[in-house]
């Protein structure tokens, strides 16, 4: 009886994914300082190590880049704020938990991540960098393509209070996940 229990446990453990890695395209709708918005394109990578069939630890990194109208004080000798064309770079590194449930070829998941973000804004001879703590709440779905590969799509809200006036960004990513 004990041997049967051990063999059944080992067999079911082989069916569980020990973890996964993901790499894909990512879009962010970033709210910058002073209420400005920027549509940024970039990449997102993550790795998950499963500790329970439905719970894992996640490491996540992303980079987003793009043009934006950036506020500048006293442009052209004026005393009011004006906007100049510039560039934005946003990099994030986070750690958190992911809950998931596999049913057939579909695996929906939700995750909560904490970490840091670095935002660089530059335009016409000036630049501004901000670093702050961030929290991300995200949901997504993996659709199994083969035994080891799945297509992942996820979206969520990135919140920070450390940048001037705070920042709320939306992020959506899609790409290939490898399960091991």
Q: Where do the protein language model's features map onto the residues?
A:
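Surface-exposed strand-loop-strand hairpins of Gram-negative outer-membrane beta-barrel proteins
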Residues: 27-46, 130-133
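Hydrophobic/aromatic beta-strand elements that line small-molecule binding cavities or substrate pockets
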Residues: 140
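Extracellular loop and loop/strand-boundary signature of outer-membrane beta-barrel proteins
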Residues: 30-33, 78-85, 122-127, 158-163
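Predominantly the C-terminal beta-signal and adjacent terminal strand-loop region
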Residues: 137, 145-180
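Short N-terminal segments immediately surrounding and downstream of signal-peptide cleavage
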Residues: 15-32
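Transmembrane beta-strands of outer-membrane beta-barrel proteins
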Residues: 22-26, 60-62, 111-113, 154-156
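Gram-negative (and chloroplast) outer-membrane scaffold detector with strong preference
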Residues: 48-124, 132-135, 143-145, 170-179
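Cleavable N-terminal export/targeting peptides
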Residues: 1-17
């Amino acid at each position: 009886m004990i041997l049967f229990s051990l063999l059944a446990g080992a067999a079911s453990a082989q069916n569980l994914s020990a973890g996964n890695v993901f790499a894909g395209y990512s879009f962010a709708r970033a709210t910058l300082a002073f209420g400005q918005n920027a549509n940024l394109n970039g990449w997102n990578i993550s790795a998950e190590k499963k500790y329970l069939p439905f719970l894992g630890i996640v490491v996540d990194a992303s980079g987003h880049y793009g043009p934006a109208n950036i506020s500048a004080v006293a442009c052209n000798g004026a005393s009011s704020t004006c906007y100049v064309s510039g560039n934005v770079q946003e990099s994030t590194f986070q750690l958190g938990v992911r809950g998931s449930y596999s049913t057939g070829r579909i695996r929906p998941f939700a995750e909560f991540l904490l970490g840091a973000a670095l935002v660089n804004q530059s335009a016409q001879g000036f630049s501004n960098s901000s670093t702050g703590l961030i929290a991300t709440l995200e949901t997504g779905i993996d659709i199994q393509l083969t035994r080891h590969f799945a297509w992942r799509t996820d979206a969520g809200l990135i919140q920070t209070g450390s940048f001037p006036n705070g920042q709320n960004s939306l992020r959506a990513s899609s790409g290939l996940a490898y399960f091991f």
